[in-house]
């Protein structure tokens, strides 16, 4: 249940607020203040009357009615605090940062169950427990850093792991990737990855909402809902990429000890992602690189031109693209010779286009214009430009900026010199661009995207598992050990597994009529003895 009070709270209380910004209760209050939250902010601390300039109350029973409560107190104290806040203070959204719940012990799981029963009874949202929090442009209710640049058209990040969410943000910020929201669902007692996707799907506004979703998943509790809502969002124009951690036996065990996650078959995960149209990634760098690619204009083909002033990176990028089934076609003929004549002697235009270390911003502009207007066999351009620190790159990156604004073909900026050209890269990112610092990671990520299937064309239905009916069917099966076909069909339907239509008849005309109605091909099978060879 995702309430408006979670997304846009008019008032927030931090229970366990602290003046020590190195504690979760202090760090989250600091982030709320520095993030410019404009609603009413309250703190609960039994030893202070004021915390970081915010009025503090000794007990939750003393605060006014509040929309959102953030709990940074020991796990054992959380159930009673949630009960008081929901029952007496009209709180409709909770973020529980505390650990020590179902991810650790049975006793902790009991505490979680009590909290869940309370929030459900009062119609409140629950993020966590065991999470870093939630943030959007309205409020930064997280205790971690970095806080990324937030923008309505930025990326939505949903993560099972708080630490992984932080490390994904670290990776993304250096690339210039902006965010719309960050969801750390932790133990996902009430709200998990599937619930967030469902909310985004059911409330999707194509005019205002982010179209990019990045997921880090440790457990898929409801594969049907994940498939249904992910594919629905993609069909509405969204792009989704995900890491599913815990694919190995050891990894599954690690995930279980981390957030109490339940293992999923990796082959089943692969099939689900492919059917939904989700781009599967295997590392944080890959995920954020895919996210950056998603922000650029959509590719219309698989043919790439590479423009560089350094031969080695161009070769490695060519290899990475080729391994992924993408093309770096040879550029030749009169147009290529014409371009070569405008570059310094020794430059190469066969693709990669190498303008040499002495190449100028004007040479880069020329190459981009030729790739856009004159090379018909090129669908997109990769531009690799760094520096050993001998010259500045401002003019070169200004050319990239100008061309990216107007070019009819996507341009992928690969600016590897994030130290020696740090100021230039920062200025480039400040203009709203992203940067791919590593050409091989970019090539691999592009291959993932280009080779990911679209969502299944057939309508995906949200099937439920009817456990009571399954039990009745099993109980009705004869004790001789043979399960007749109609029992199998009933079990599959009750388990929510789609099956093809069947028809049993001993009449030729009826069989032909059925085939014409359903369409070919049709499989014919004898109904009768278990061993068909007994009857010929």
Residue ranges and their predicted role:
Residues 1-536:
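Catalytic-core regions of core metabolic enzymes
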């Amino acid at each position: 249940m995702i309430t408006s009070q979670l997304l846009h709270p008019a008032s927030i209380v931090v229970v366990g607020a602290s003046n020590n910004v190195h504690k979760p209760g202090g760090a989250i209050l600091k982030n709320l203040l520095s993030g410019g939250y404009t609603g009413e902010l309250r703190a609960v601390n039994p030893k202070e009357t004021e915390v970081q300039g915010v009025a503090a109350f000794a007990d939750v029973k003393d605060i006014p009615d509040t929309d959102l409560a953030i709990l940074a107190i020991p796990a054992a104290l959380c159930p009673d605090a949630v009960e008081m806040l929901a029952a007496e203070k009209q709180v409709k959204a909770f973020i529980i940062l505390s650990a020590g719940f179902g991810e650790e012990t049975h006793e902790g799981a009991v505490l979680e169950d009590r909290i869940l029963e309370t929030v459900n009874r009062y119609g409140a949202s629950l993020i966590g427990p065991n999470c870093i929090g939630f943030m959007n442009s309205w409020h930064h209710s997280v205790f971690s850093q970095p806080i990324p640049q937030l923008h309505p058209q930025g990326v939505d990040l949903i993560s099972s792991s708080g630490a992984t969410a932080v490390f994904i943000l670290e990776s993304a910020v250096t690339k210039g990737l902006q965010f719309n929201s960050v969801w750390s669902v932790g133990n996902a007692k009430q709200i998990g990855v599937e619930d967030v996707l469902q909310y985004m799907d059911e409330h999707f506004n194509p005019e205002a909402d982010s179209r990019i979703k990045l997921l880090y998943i440790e457990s898929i509790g409801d594969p049907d809902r994940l498939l249904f809502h992910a594919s629905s969002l993609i069909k509405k124009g969204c792009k989704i990429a995900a890491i599913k951690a815990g694919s190995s036996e050891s990894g599954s065990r690690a995930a279980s000890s981390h957030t109490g996650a339940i293992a999923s078959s990796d082959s089943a995960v692969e099939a689900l992602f492919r059917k939904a149209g989700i781009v599967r990634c295997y590392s944080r760098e890959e995920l954020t690189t895919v996210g950056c690619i998603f922000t650029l204009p959509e590719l219309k083909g698989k043919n790439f031109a590479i423009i560089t002033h350094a031969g080695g990176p161009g070769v490695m990028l060519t290899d990475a693209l080729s391994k992924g089934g993408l093309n770096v076609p040879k550029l030749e003929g009169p147009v290529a010779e014409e371009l070569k004549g405008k570059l310094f002697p020794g430059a190469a235009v066969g693709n990669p286009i190498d303008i040499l270390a002495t190449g100028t911003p004007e040479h880069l502009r020329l190459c981009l214009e030729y790739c856009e207007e004159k090379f018909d066999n090129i669908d997109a351009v990769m531009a690799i430009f760094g520096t050993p620190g001998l010259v500045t790159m401002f003019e070169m990156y200004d050319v990239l900026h100008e061309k990216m604004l107007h070019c009819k073909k996507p341009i992928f900026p690969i600016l590897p010199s994030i130290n020696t050209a740090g100021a230039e890269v920062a200025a480039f990112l400040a203009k709203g661009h992203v940067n791919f610092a590593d050409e091989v990671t970019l090539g691999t990520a592009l291959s993932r995207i280009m080779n990911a299937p679209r969502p299944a064309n057939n309508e995906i239905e949200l099937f439920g598992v009817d456990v009571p009916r399954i039990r009745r069917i099993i109980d009705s099966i004869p004790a001789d050990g043979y399960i007749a076909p109609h029992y199998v069909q009933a079990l599959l339907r009750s388990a929510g597994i789609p099956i093809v239509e069947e028809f049993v008849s001993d009449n030729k005309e009826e069989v032909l009529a059925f085939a014409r109605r359903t369409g070919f091909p049709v499989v014919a099978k004898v109904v009768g003895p278990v061993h068909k060879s007994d009857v010929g």
